[in-house]
């Protein structure tokens, strides 16, 4: 399963990147579960706690957490995404990408490089393909519990 993490539009005028991601996953033949943390039709949050709990459970259950961060100001701030990225980075199931023109993204790029020795993928379709590969790889090893900080995977810096 893949959780599509990243900014969510805050109004109905802003197009969601997740629609495109789901269409492409379908075309690529992904047959797993895709967790999409937004409503199928735009509407304001009815209950923040219910939404946050649903997302937390889906993040825990997902095999891969794919962060696509097309941050643009003032349309998609992605403040919550920053927290989620930091929280889940060492879970061993994060893959990260963003378009080259994403705003205020240098720190996330730096963390990903330092902790995974990887650069973010700058193309959504490529990120989706790599997410599918990672999901296949991790599926049998999947741990459905949040790892304590002492057991989170931190790659050795070179």
Task: Explain the meaning of each model-derived region.
Residues 1-158:
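Conserved catalytic or regulatory cores that recognize and/or transform ribose-phosphate-containing ligands
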């Amino acid at each position: 399963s893949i959780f599509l993490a990243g900014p969510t539009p805050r109004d109905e005028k802003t197009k969601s990147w997740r629609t495109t991601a789901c269409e492409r996953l379908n075309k690529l033949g992904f047959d797993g579960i895709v967790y999409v943390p937004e409503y199928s039709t735009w509407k304001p949050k009815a209950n923040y706690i219910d939404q946050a709990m649903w997302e937390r459970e889906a993040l825990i259950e997902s095999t891969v957490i794919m962060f696509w961060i097309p941050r643009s100001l003032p349309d998609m701030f992605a403040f919550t995404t920053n927290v989620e990225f930091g929280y889940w980075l060492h879970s061993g199931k994060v893959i990260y990408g963003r378009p080259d023109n994403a705003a205020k993204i240098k720190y996330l790029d730096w963390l990903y490089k330092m902790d995974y020795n990887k650069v973010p993928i700058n193309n959504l379709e490529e990120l989706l393909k790599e997410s599918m590969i990672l999901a296949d790889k991790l599926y049998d090893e999947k741990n459905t519990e949040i790892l304590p900080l002492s057991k989170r995977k931190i790659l050795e810096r070179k």
